[in-house]
Each structure stands twice: as C-alpha cells, then as structure tokens.
Amino acid sequence: MGTRRSLAAAALAGLCLTAACSSSAAAPAPSPARSRPVATIVPASRAAASPTRAAPPAPVPRVSVSRVRTADGAVVTVATFSGPVQYVLHNGSGDPGPAAAGLVRAGPAVGGAERRRLLAAFNGGFKLSAGAGGYEQEGHVISPLRAGLISLVIDRSGRARIGVWGHGLPAPGEAVYSVRQNLQPLVKHGRPTPAAADWGLWGATLGGGEYVARSALGQNASGELIYAASISASPYDLASALVRRGARIAMELDINPEWVQLDIARVPGGRLTAAVPGQDRPADQYLVGWTRDYITVLASAG
C-alpha cells in the first residue's frame, strides 16, 4: 500500500514537472536586458601611482645639412633651418651700402648681441644695380619693390616667408619689416618653374657658363626656410634639390664664386664653419663685415 502511494506521488510529481517544463517552453523568451557600461573605480592610491605621459620635448633651433646629387651630377648643399629661429637682413658696406647705412641697425658686420644667438648666415641677392628687384630694410625702402617678383619678407618679430610680391604678399595687415627681391620664382607649387630650365634668365655668370656657383632659398609647407648652394650647378639643379627637400616655393639668390656663402654653427653662438664645399670666403666673413647684403639665422630670443 505504501509502495503504491509512493508511485502515485512520483507520477504526480512527474506530471507537474512535465507541465512546468511545457509551460516554460511555450512562454516567449524574455528580451535580453540592455547592457550598460560599468564604471571602473580606481583607488586613489593606484591612480596616483599610474604613470603619466611625458610631454614632448620643446623644439630647439637647429640647422640640418645634407647633400643632393642631381640628375646631371651636380652636388648641391641643402640646409633647413627649423625650430624657434629669427631672421635678420643685413646691409652690405658696398651694396646697398651708403643708401642704407644711416637708416638701419643691421650693418655689414654681425653685432655682439646677435653673435651670441647666431646659428647661420648666408648670402643675399644680386647687386641692386642689376635690376633684379627691390630692397627694403627695417621699414626703409632703399630700392622700390616691384610687383610680380619673388620676395623674401621678414616681419618685425624676425619671422620670414617667401612669396610673389603683389600676389597675396603682403597679406592685408601684414607687418612688413624687411624685403629682399630677386628675379622671378625658381620653384612654385612644389615644382621647378618652366623658367628654371633656361639658365640664361638667371643672371650673368662668370665666364658665361651654365654651371657656376649659385645659391637659392626656398620654403616648405611648414614655413621653414631652406637654403641651397653649389660651387657648380645650374638654376634647375638648385630648383630640383630644393623640391626634393620639400620646398613649395623658392627664389634664386646670388651667383658666382665670390658671393655664394653659407656658414653654420653647431649651437647658437658657436664657432662657424663653411658649409658649401669650395666656397670662396672664410666662415667668419660676416662677423668681420662684408660688402654685400646677407641674412643671419638666430636662435629665437623668446
């Protein structure tokens, strides 16, 4: 009798379990709960101990020098001036000479205060009598500026840029302090101009040859100035070397052996060395004074 009751109870339990399973299976599955982000709490002691990302080092003024061998075999020295630097246009004792001597402070020799910050110095453009462009220094127009000519423009703070005068240069409200013009663009929009291939357009050369000492100045997309020179090169050689080093625009500077010069120091105020192999003048020429205009590159004062 007891055994039958146990079997009946077990059967009833089996029915209930089966019904429960059937009912559960028939019911629609509940929609999954939407996941929510879980905040992770970091103890103050651990947060304080977590390493912090180091700030990037502050940029330093420097000159990066390289050599570029062009398609026709010319070797061009290229120097890029980067970091916090300032530029100063200097009057030469002979050109512009007396026309600017009583008006400007930056004369034929690098001054003492400037010497302590001097990172590099390089030659300017043609003699003003060559008619290659105008000249303004420290707000004084020594030779009239001409529209359509490539120009190095330096503002009062020492920042520099290169552009075509009268074509977006100067910009409205731009504080022009010094301007050095020299011929037409050598590089424009990151390419040598068509005129770069016609060497006869780029000044009278010593001996009337195409391959002579030449120099040029370009600017890259970051605003850095790039100087290029060779003791034996064509205008197109300089243009192609500058483009390979990132120049978007460039101008030819002076030509012929006596005038092409780049002197650089490893650190601001350090000993200068001649950077263009075969350049004619000694590395201290601009320190003792020079007859032609030139540009100094200084470590920024601020």
Task: For each feature predicted by the language model, list its residue ranges.
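A short catalytic or substrate-binding loop motif that flags glycine-/basic-rich loops and adjacent residues
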Residues: 6-7, 70-73, 143-146, 208-210, ...
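Conserved hydrophobic/aromatic beta-strand scaffold that supports enzyme active sites
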Residues: 76-80, 151, 185, 216, ...
